Amino acid sequence: MSQGIITKVSGPLVVAEGLPEAKMFDVVKVGNQGLIGEIIEIRGERVSIQVYEETSGLGPGDPVVSTGEPLSVELGPGMLEGIFDGIQRPLDVIEKKVGSFITRGIDVPSLNREKKWKFTPKVKSGDKVSGGDIIGTVQETVIVEHRIMVPPAISGIVEDIREGEYTVTEPIARIKTDSGQIVEITMMQKWPVRKARPYKEKLPPEIPMPTGQRVIDTLFPVTKGGTACIPGPFGSGKTVVQHQLAKWADAEIVVYIGCGERGNEMTDVLLEFPELKDPKTEEPLMKRTVLIANTSNMPVAAREASIYTGITIAEYFRDMGYSVALMADSTSRWAEALREMSGRLEEMPGEEGYPAYLARRLAEFYERAGRVICLGSDNREGALTVVGAVSPPGGDLSEPVTQATLRVVKVFWALDSELAYARHFPAINWLTSYSLYSDVVEDYMNKNVSSDWGELRSEAMRLLQEEASLQEIVRLVGIDVLSTRDRLVLEVARSIREDFLHQNAFHEVDTYSSMEKQYRMLKLIMIFYQEAQKALEKGVPFSEIEKHPVREKIARAKYVEESKLTVFDEIEKEIKKAMQGLIEGGAADA
């Protein structure tokens, strides 16, 4: 370990000299308290260090010690149900040790060193293994089996492996490598956060990831291994959408990064997730969740690390063959941390003061998503889906972070303040949002849910777009100038908006809709549209169609429980019968 001295302190940036062996991104201990920092620039003898803790009290002449290792995370049993800060320090352990506030320079191991885990081998002595092979399992929580893998760079023959209870640092197996060296394998691996974990092959993202949110799954779907962003102004519901995705997305593991957002939002997650039951296993959602809390009152520099910490943990679970969803809330705060450090380094600023390399850093982050064939001889498949929230100041989508994000992500869920103020949630604007996965998902849904899924979706989108142009006419000259056909379009589009797209996150039934239920709900509205068109052609007055009691049943369909979807067949019959009754009644009057 080489030691240098501080020559300058500027907020979270510390400049030091006397570290000749220092390398980029090495972790250093700064000052007498041993604050954790990372080398982010080397110019001759001078190294610039980004410190992940409050730097008040540091001054020139204080010592700086380099560890010679990059910023790494500990990967092994004990991460699930955990809540960590941006550099993977467990907050519950810190709270027991020093109370409610994190003491500067506190050094606690990320994974519990005392707890013993029951290890069950999957290979035996004499077997040949290579990087990524699963050599055994640990039942980490009731619903997640933690698969212990050979580290990526190691291959050879298993010399010794035993079942039993071990801590994460005790050897569970010994492998004789091809060069004859004996390597001891523990349940814990260390991995540098800025380096993507390796895989065999990247696959196209073709399988949809149902989220239970109708506007997302039907109109703007995301796939397993896909990338999505949620930009929106303050108060438009970004965090609630992220929470909904974390709760109901069809992923086996969820990593939730609270990066620079309010502390009470992380508190909500901590209070809600243990109470909520996973629809597939009926166990608390917390049993499959890792939380990274790096709230707005924590040091700015640690926000940058938190995003990388989160995605490295997510990649590790992906390598086991799991489908992982990563929520980053919000990447704007991360970009602001980059801007602050760039300013302190006196770099040439780009647009709005952000560094010129902002787009590259964002692309590097989102490119770590994907559906892959993992390392290992069993060719297992894993997927990592990344959803990043963006908080543009004033909801201005032309600002650099949003624009750089849009260049790399494939799904854009644009949150609209007008919809939010009108209490339409989720406030995803159906006219400006898009998904580049919709064609792939359409093929999948046509095969697996119903052959007319694609037609229904296209028709719904057409009606919503037609409604937008008709509303302009209505605003200018009033609704009376519209033909009855146009008035029907407005009425059906309103039904799509209010009865289908609008969803109550806090209602026990409406909070989640399966793909089957979404299809049945949309089909009801479209059957009503087709039957109402026939009734209009037969001369039935529009007012009678508009006021018919069957409309109420369509509106209440969202509250039908998943176990009672046969109710939709009855409502379909009622709609056809009601419209037929209107036609026959009109014919009798004539």
From Swiss-Prot:
| GO BP terms in the entry | proton motive force-driven plasma membrane ATP synthesis
Q: Name one GO cellular component term.
A: proton-transporting two-sector ATPase complex, catalytic domain
Pfam families, per this entry?
A: ATP-synt_ab (PF00006), ATP-synt_ab_N (PF02874), ATP-synt_ab_Xtn (PF16886), ATP-synt_VA_C (PF22919)
Which PROSITE patterns does UniProt cross-reference here? ATPASE_ALPHA_BETA (PS00152)
Binding of ATP: at which residues?
232-239
According to its UniProt record, the EC number is: 7.1.2.2
Q: Which reaction does it catalyse?
A: ATP + H2O + 4 H(+)(in) = ADP + phosphate + 5 H(+)(out)
Question: SUPFAM superfamilies recorded for this chain?
Answer: C-terminal domain of alpha and beta subunits of F1 ATP synthase, N-terminal domain of alpha and beta subunits of F1 ATP synthase, P-loop containing nucleoside triphosphate hydrolases
Its domain of life reads Bacteria
- Mention one GO molecular function: ATP binding
Keywords (A to Z) from UniProt: ATP synthesis, ATP-binding, Hydrogen ion transport, Ion transport, Nucleotide-binding, Translocase, Transport
Function text: Produces ATP from ADP in the presence of a proton gradient across the membrane. The V-type alpha chain is a catalytic subunit.
Which family does the similarity line name? Belongs to the ATPase alpha/beta chains family.
* Name the record gives this protein: V-type ATP synthase alpha chain
